Amino acid sequence: MAWEAIDIYRQLVRTNPAPHTADLARALNILTLNLSRAGRAHEALAAVQEAVTFYRSLAQVDPAAYKPDLAACLHNLATCLSDVGDRSAALAAIRETAAIRRELAERDPATHSPALAPCLHRLTKRLAEAGHRGESLQTAREAVAAYRSLVRRRPEDFGQGLAGALRTYASVLEWAGKEADAARIRQESEAMTEDKALEDSIRGF
């Protein structure tokens, strides 16, 4: 079904690109997810690369409408690149995703901060895997700060995200030789996890 939709959109884009390019990009991004779940990593990568190309051109024409889609598609590109073993290109893709998410959140925090925080957390992990200690530490701090801001407004939605970001931050601090800071941050994360477990237990009665 996805292939049929893409074939139709390709024909429409060839004859009248303006109203149909976004539909083709969206269909390719959906196909990427389906191929990835099916273990067809190289086909998924080809599909998402094409989708990113379309979203880049759309975002140049209408940034407000399509930069969020470009960021989401770049995130999928990073995942696909990692799946085929290209960690360097995956890191570049997630860096670009984070740069776009930062820009969007700066302009409209209420709308875009919920996507920025987990993006920064993922970038922290990628940077750590690549051995970029200083940058991973800086990004971990940024991720925690983004989650703290979200938790102040919606603790039930973002509390566990903050706990996870704190765990990662503690690991990076430990890697950087900041043992005391790492212990303090890890303790905060554990306390949040215990509070959530107690809350869930109470609700279960």
Briefly describe each language-model feature range.
Residues V13, A59, L104-E106, L150-R152, ...:
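Boundary/linker segments of alpha-helical solenoid repeat arrays
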Residues P19, D23-R26, A46, A65, ...:
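Residue register of alpha-helical TPR repeats
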Residues A22-R37, P68-D83, P114-E129, Q160-S171:
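Conserved alpha-helical positions within TPR/SEL1-like repeat arrays
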Residues W175, E179-F205:
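Terminal, low-structured helical/coil segments at or just beyond the last alpha-helical repeat
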